[in-house]
């Protein structure tokens, strides 16, 4: 009976571990991270915490070009680098795919150490032309009752601002970024109806030689928005490109 009790206890411990940890990296999973971060920030009231989210640009290409085994090696190394300074006030997790999260005291965050860690990760691809771009968003926790999922969203909003900037690896969240994100999502939500309502218009801007002779024209697109007026490409082209929707505008115009 004692042996059965011990076996049952060990199985229970293993089941709890599987339910709370990522099987590949051994880090906490998303749900456990949310729970533990909420508990920690409310336990240490005198500590200001950062919540940091990281992502690897175009990680799917690593799996496609180098194979799943190489992709898993990168994820495991990323996990080790993220969790390289453990303490009772540091929590690290793999949220999903190539997305990781870290919560730690503000005074323990070191940008130089982050840059060094990213360089270490990039060495996985030394000797070939593939450039690994890892980027992070940092959110300072001010409202300890805010849902951790919202904190993660805000850190990711900051991270997304440097997704295509290979010279930068860390970005900090502020409320202005949230306003921009909301505006971008609003435009994306209006894009499909705008196509159906023929709100996009192409203008041809003449190009002339020095002698005044015409040599062609440049096609310029304007969004004739029903409530915002005429929007120039600067207001929506980058948003559509980042969302992978620019091809729909190309098909519509041409």
What does each of the following model-derived ranges do?
Residues 50, 97-103, 128-160, 168-174:
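A short glycine-enriched loop-to-beta-strand structural element that forms part of the catalytic core
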Residues 1-13:
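Single conserved hydrophobic/aromatic residue that forms the stacking wall/gate
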Residues 43, 148, 157-201, 239-244:
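C-di-GMP signaling machinery
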Residues 36, 183-239:
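Active-site core of bacterial EAL-family cyclic-dinucleotide phosphodiesterase domains
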Residues 16-21, 26-50, 57-83, 87, ...:
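Conserved long alpha-helical elements within nucleotide-processing catalytic cores of c-di-GMP signaling
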Residues 103-106, 141-142, 224, 241:
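Residue-level recognition of strand-loop junctions within catalytic nucleotide-signaling folds
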């Amino acid at each position: 009976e004692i042996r059965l009790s011990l076996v049952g206890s060990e199985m229970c411990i293993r089941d709890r571990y599987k339910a709370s940890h990522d099987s590949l990296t051994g880090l906490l999973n998303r749900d456990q991270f949310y729970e533990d971060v909420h508990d920690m920030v409310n336990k240490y009231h005198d500590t200001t915490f950062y919540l940091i989210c990281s992502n690897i640009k175009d990680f799917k290409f690593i799996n496609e070009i180098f194979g799943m085994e190489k992709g898993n090696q990168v994820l495991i190394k990323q996990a080790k680098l993220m969790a390289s300074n453990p303490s009772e006030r540091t929590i690290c997790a793999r949220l999903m795919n190539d997305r990781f999260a870290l919560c730690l005291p503000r005074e323990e965050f070191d940008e130089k150490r982050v840059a060094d860690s990213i360089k270490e990760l990039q060495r996985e691809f030394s000797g070939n032309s593939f450039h690994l771009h890892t980027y992070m968003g940092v959110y300072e926790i001010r409202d300890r009752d805010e849902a951790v999922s919202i904190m993660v969203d805000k850190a990711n909003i900051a991270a997304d601002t440097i997704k295509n900037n290979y010279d930068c690896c860390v970005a900090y969240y502020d409320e202005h970024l949230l306003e921009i994100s909301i505006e971008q999502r609003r435009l994306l939500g209006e894009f499909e109806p705008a196509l159906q309502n023929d709100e996009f218009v192409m203008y041809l801007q003449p190009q002339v030689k020095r002698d005044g002779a015409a040599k062609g024209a440049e096609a310029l697109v304007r969004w004739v928005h029903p409530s915002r007026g005429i929007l120039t490409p600067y207001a929506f082209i980058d948003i559509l490109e980042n969302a992978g929707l620019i091809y729909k505008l190309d098909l519509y115009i041409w």
